[in-house]
Amino acid sequence: MATFLFKTVALLVLQSPQQDLWARVNADSTDGPAWLELGRAYLQRAADYHTHRKPVTVDTVWAHANLDTAQFAFERAARWSAGTRTADSARVYRVYAFGEWAYVDWEAAGSAAATLTWHSLPEGLRLPPVLEELGENLLRACPHRGILFTAGETDTQAAWYLRFSRGL
């Protein structure tokens, strides 16, 4: 299993359009902003999973590998840029990556799988208070058994985070 994961990650690195970001990270592994940009690039690649443009059945391994790489990059960005906007952004993107992971699992296996993914969120990983308040306001404004339409990904992720990981 470890060999398979290593080969998958190696394949992602070799085929990635983010080679310049990998070069920056290899030159200075403590470059927090480079890790953040790398994570954002992999998060975008994982979000492309939802387009389902391929005529064959889409495999979730590719999306999960991209999300794992994004999580790894965001963890590094937060670690090497402690106390900065880069670290704050990295923490928000880590929660966003969990939301994308839950979305992939929801498409593949239903709402129970998405809920389990949200429950695997580390306890110490939280959205900033302003985004938690946004999600709470959206959820409280929605009637019981109502349908919540959001204006964008920020609203959606904040609402999903509070609904599924915090149980609101």
What kind of feature is each model-predicted range?
Residues T51-V56, L116-H119, A141:
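Acidic/histidine-rich, surface-exposed loop or edge segments in extracytoplasmic proteins
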